């Protein structure tokens, strides 16, 4: 058990009975030493150091509830976030993860305009009703229409007049044999016998109209004939195809976006809020710092109705500081990621399981969720992170190998890989993430002191297959602990294990001839 007094004492036994409160209290939290001649220590543990203790269970894995709070205002259907990294999360992955019930955090290594466009892409990917559909006026050229269709991957555009009234619909079929790119869209669009829906039409009513008329796009107009929305057959199909998707009040997928302490911070936050970002992630390698705390206060003062995730921290004091500054969720993790070298380069950090417990000890009574960022290698690690007090886990390398990630696909020795790099790597810092590590964005790349590396991860296929295995592992773990939901899982006990115990936990004394989709020793 972790000692209850005297931070330097050895751990006397192998059974650790520390659900949530085991690291609470002044003698067990990571506070700065007040006496410069005395150094206090606690034992720092990570996922491989412990196992969850099985308990009496009256629930089957398929019946557990895995919904969780991302912030006080946002509920996710699965406790999974994708990392705000430029080889992990852009619109395609954010869309795929939101459809499965999680949330993608778009990286910030791009211009404000491009990041806002990425948010817009997620929001437009599906919707109960598109309230701001892409439109063209009657005097636009066919070439403009084709470009818009290509850029937004859409097959039709409503055409409006100067007053906003619906004048017609332009689809791929109308343009199939057109060669004059300067011809006006009004000359080729469908304008007679337009089928529309009145304001207030719900999805069921829209589906009946679409089915009866055999069309794919249904403009919604008000009593004055002005276009106020668009309902598509594809959006209706998405509702049934992805029943676990997380959506906002308008039926659009949820998405987050990262920002840093930079000169364009407030402009970036404003742009992201304007296009509908559901949560902003104020991202730093060291969240317990003056710059982050002041930036957080400034954002909360100027944008009162916005959810902010702030981080990263690894101590009780750090978590409390961000909570007091207005964070709606706190992200935990200094150095646990597979591509992060902070602990080696800077000598600073806290093993991830202990860091999660530290943060949760500070925040649980405040009702502010903890996000465990980094260090997840197996599905069981996610279960342990949640049991230690996290509400969600954020993963980078796990998602970096998926089809939807933005990293380049490469072939090496006959196998497919995807590029993956830390945001503290030279490559990432040179294109925008240096402020995350408090380094001058204008400096020559040779002057950077990297805290991450660039590498590759095995190609893993579609994201939904990865999510399926992680959700399955979580359900299994909750079943073993007798937990009906994540709150009950956080009351589970841990047992501290030795290296021999971990070797015993892995497959051993056998040569694996057929790999499982959720297990590898590499």
Label the predicted regions.
Residues 5, 21-22:
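Glycine-biased, low-complexity coil/linker segments
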Residues 30-56, 136-137, 198, 205-208, ...:
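Alpha/beta catalytic cores of nucleotide-metabolism and tRNA/nucleoside-modifying enzymes
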Residues 60, 64-76, 83-85, 114-154, ...:
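Bateman/CBS regulatory modules and CBS-like beta-alpha motifs in cytosolic regions of diverse proteins
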Residues 75-80, 129-132, 249-257, 300-314, ...:
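Short beta-strand/loop segments at the ligand-binding rim of alpha/beta enzyme cores
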Residues 93-94, 267-272, 314-332, 377-391:
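Catalytic cores of alpha/beta
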Residues 102-114, 280, 284-289, 332-346, ...:
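Glycine-rich phosphate-binding active-site loops on the catalytic face of alpha/beta enzymes
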Residues 106-111, 154, 158, 165-181, ...:
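Short beta->alpha transition motifs characteristic of CBS
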Residues 112-119, 228, 232-245, 264-266, ...:
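Active-site-adjacent beta->alpha loops and helix N-cap segments on the catalytic face
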């Amino acid at each position: 058990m972790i000692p209850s007094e005297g931070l330097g004492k050895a751990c006397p036994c192998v059974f650790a009975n520390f659900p949530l409160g085991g690291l609470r209290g002044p003698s067990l939290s990571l506070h700065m030493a007040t006496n410069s001649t005395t150094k206090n220590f606690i034992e720092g543990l990570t996922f491989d150091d412990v196992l969850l203790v099985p308990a009496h269970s009256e629930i089957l894995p398929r019946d557990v509830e895995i919904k969780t709070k991302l912030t006080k205002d946002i509920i996710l259907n699965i406790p999974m976030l994708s990392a705000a990294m430029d080889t992990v999360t852009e619109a395609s992955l954010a869309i795929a993860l939101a459809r499965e019930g999680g949330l993608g955090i778009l990286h910030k290594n791009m211009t404000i305009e491009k990041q806002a466009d990425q948010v817009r892409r997620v929001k437009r990917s599906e919707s109960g009703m598109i309230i701001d559909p892409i439109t063209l006026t009657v005097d636009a050229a066919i070439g403009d229409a084709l470009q818009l269709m290509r850029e937004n991957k859409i097959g039709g555009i409503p055409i409006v007049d100067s007053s906003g009234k619906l004048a017609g619909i332009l689809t791929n079929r109308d343009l199939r044999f057109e060669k004059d790119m300067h011809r006006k869209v009004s000359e080729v669009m469908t304008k007679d016998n337009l089928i529309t829906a009145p304001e207030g039409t719900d999805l069921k009513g829209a589906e009946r109209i679409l089915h009866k008329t055999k069309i794919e796009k249904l403009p919604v107009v008000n009593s004055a004939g002005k276009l106020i929305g668009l309902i598509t057959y594809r959006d209706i199909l998405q509702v049934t195809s992805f029943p676990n998707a997380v959506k906002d009040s308008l039926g659009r997928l949820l998405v987050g976006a990262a920002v840093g302490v930079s000169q364009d911070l407030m402009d970036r936050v404003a742009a992201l809020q304007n296009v509908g970002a559901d949560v902003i992630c104020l991202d730093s390698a060291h969240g317990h710092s003056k710059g982050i705390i002041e930036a957080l206060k400034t954002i909360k003062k100027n944008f009162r109705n916005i959810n902010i995730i702030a981080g990263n921290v690894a101590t009780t004091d750090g978590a409390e500081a961000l909570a007091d500054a207005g964070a709606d969720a706190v992200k935990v993790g200094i150095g646990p990621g597979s591509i992060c070298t902070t602990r080696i380069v800077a000598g600073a950090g806290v093993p991830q399981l202990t860091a999660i417990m530290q943060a949760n000890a500070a925040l649980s009574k405040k009702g502010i969720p903890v996000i465990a960022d980094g260090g997840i290698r197996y599905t069981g690690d996610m279960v342990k992170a949640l049991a230690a007090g996290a509400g969600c886990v954020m993963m980078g390398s796990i998602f970096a190998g998926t089809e939807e990630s933005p990293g380049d696909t490469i072939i090496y020795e006959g196998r497919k890989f995807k590029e993956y790099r830390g945001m503290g790597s030279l490559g990432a810092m040179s294109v925008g993430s240096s402020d995350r590590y408090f380094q001058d964005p204008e400096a020559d790349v040779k002057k950077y002191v990297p805290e991450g590396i660039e590498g590759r991860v095995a190609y893993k296929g579609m994201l939904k297959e990865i999510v399926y295995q992680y959700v399955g592992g979580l359900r299994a773990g909750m079943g073993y602990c007798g937990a009906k939901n994540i709150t009950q899982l956080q009351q589970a006990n841990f047992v501290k294990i030795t290296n021999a115990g971990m070797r015993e936990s892995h497959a051993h004394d056998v040569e694996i001839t057929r790999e499982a989709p959720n297990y590898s020793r590499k």
